[in-house]
């Protein structure tokens, strides 16, 4: 069976790899000149299942109003003329209840934990190297109110069986020694020892090479124009004026997925959340991070690679604007020098931006559609790297008519519609 995968970011490449392992003949098509050259290129570098949380959370609407007035706020909104921006924000607001937050976080943690296990298995089987570390993630709280509010997340972690530690200042210095010098700025932390880090772009590039070894064909520099369909099936994909055909099609185009789905009558609420990162060369390894820290105040992650520090975060709801905002660089530099003033050379840092494909409830869209041979793997938001291996393997199992290893509840596009025309196709029953 031939499968055409659209997109070669970490999600598309992982999909291709696991589909090839399942015995499919796979062709990957992408407009870039290689894998992971857009959103997967310079993300924060975290594989953090326990911190898989939706942006839509209780209290966020009030916080957002406050953030809009702050210089170093984690969120910014630039209104556009695109109606989908307003529709997406309204759907997000509807998910900001305690009940919806708990449901959405459970779905995200379920897929993220599974994905981390798949990554562990892949690394053990293949030895794939990507400057990875398995030293956990530490969420830093600058105020007592932040530490107290973490209790709700801890309750979800306990229900999901995710190990955690609550740290005082001495505990923070134990796991991140370089922070001992700035301990007075912190009141405590939440550490998840099973979280990991790694260079997503490096991982994706090497996974693509492994996929080629399984027979996957990558076609780069290809302009994907539209999907050709009739009835309940996709007939092909128009690429550079040529109709490419296959038995099945996987759409893994991140924020650009809705543009191809709209003519098919499929409304996928995926919208770009613009994020930024700095990549800083390390000058003093002892004063650099050991693994990943999350600054709860600014919603920024600081991650250690071999000889580099990756600082990433923030969210701009601004459409498809890829311009580099110097104020965002200033924020990332401020946070880095505030916590790790002696760790790296900020003057030599590389500044980058990417468009995270976000759903209003935080959970990605992975699974079948009302078109019998069209599958989606998109909408992973800030967690594409965290969820990549699990999403790829989960989708490959569905397409191979195998029983997935985790529950399918709430993961496909049917959760966004009560209409029978968007109901998911028949596939193996949920694992739970």
Curated annotation (Swiss-Prot):
Protein function: Catalyzes the oxidative deamination of D-amino acids. Has very broad substrate specificity; all the D-amino acids tested can be used as the substrate except D-Glu and D-Gln. Participates in the utilization of several D-amino acids as the sole source of nitrogen, i.e. D-alanine, D-histidine, D-phenylalanine, D-serine, D-threonine, and D-valine.
Q: Where is this region: Disordered?
A: 410-432
The EC number(s) this enzyme carries = 1.4.99.-
The gene from which this protein is expressed is dadA1
Q: What class of enzyme is it?
A: oxidoreductase
The metabolic or biological pathway listed in the UniProt record of this protein is:
Amino-acid degradation; D-alanine degradation; NH(3) and pyruvate from D-alanine: step 1/1
Write out the GO biological process terms: D-alanine catabolic process
What is the induction note for this entry? Answer: Is highly up-regulated by L- and D-alanine. However, it is likely that intracellular L-Ala is the signal for induction of the dadAX genes through DadR binding to several putative operator sites.
UniProt name for this protein: D-amino acid dehydrogenase 1
Q: Which GO terms describe its cellular component?
A: cytoplasm; plasma membrane
Q: Which InterPro entries match?
A: DadA, FAD-dep_OxRdtase, FAD/NAD-bd_sf
Family (UniProt) = Belongs to the DadA oxidoreductase family.
Keyword list (alphabetical) reads: FAD, Flavoprotein, Oxidoreductase
């Amino acid at each position: 069976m031939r499968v055409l995968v659209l997109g070669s970011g970490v999600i598309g490449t992982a999909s291709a790899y696991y589909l090839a392992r399942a015995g499919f003949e796979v062709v990957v098509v992408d407009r870039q000149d290689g894998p992971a050259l857009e959103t997967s290129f310079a993300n924060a570098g975290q594989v953090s299942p326990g911190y898989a949380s939706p942006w839509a959370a209780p209290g966020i609407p009030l916080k957002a109003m406050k953030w809009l007035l702050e210089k170093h706020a984690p969120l910014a909104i630039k209104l556009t003329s695109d109606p989908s921006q307003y529709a997406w924000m309204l759907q997000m607001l509807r998910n900001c209840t305690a009940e919806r937050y708990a449901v959405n976080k459970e779905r995200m943690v379920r897929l993220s934990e599974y994905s981390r296990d798949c990554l562990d298995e892949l690394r053990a089987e293949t030895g794939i190297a990507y400057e990875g570390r398995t030293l956990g993630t530490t969420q830093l709280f600058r105020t007592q109110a932040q530490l107290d509010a973490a209790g709700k997340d801890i309750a979800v972690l306990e229900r999901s069986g995710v190990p955690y530690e609550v740290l005082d200042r001495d505990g923070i210095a134990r796991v991140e020694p370089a922070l001992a010098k700035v301990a007075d700025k912190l009141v405590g932390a939440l550490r998840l020892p099973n979280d990991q880090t790694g260079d997503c772009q490096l991982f994706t590039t090497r996974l693509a090479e492994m996929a080629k070894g399984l027979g996957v064909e990558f076609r780069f520099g290809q302009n994907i124009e539209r999907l050709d369909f009739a009835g309940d099936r996709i007939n092909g994909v128009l690429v550079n004026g040529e109709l490419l055909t296959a038995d099945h099609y996987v759409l893994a185009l991140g924020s650009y997925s809705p543009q191809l789905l709209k003519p098919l009558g499929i409304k996928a609420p995926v919208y770009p959340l613009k994020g930024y990162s700095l990549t800083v060369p390390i000058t003093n390894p002892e004063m650099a991070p050991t693994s990943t820290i999350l600054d709860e105040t600014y919603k920024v992650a600081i991650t250690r690679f071999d000889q580099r520090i990756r600082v990433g975060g923030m969210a701009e709801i601004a459409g498809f604007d890829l311009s580099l905002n110097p104020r965002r660089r200033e924020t990332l530099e401020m946070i880095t020098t505030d916590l790790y003033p002696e760790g790296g050379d900020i003057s030599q840092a590389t500044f980058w931006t990417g468009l995270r494909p976000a759903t209003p409830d935080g959970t990605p869209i992975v699974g079948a559609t009302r078109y019998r041979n069209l599958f989606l793997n998109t909408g992973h938001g800030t967690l594409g790297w965290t969820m990549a291996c699990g999403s790829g393997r989960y989708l490959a199992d569905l397409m191979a008519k195998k029983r997935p290893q985790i529950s399918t509840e709430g993961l496909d596009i049917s959760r966004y519609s009560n209409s029978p025309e968007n109901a998911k196709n028949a596939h193996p029953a949920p694992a739970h």
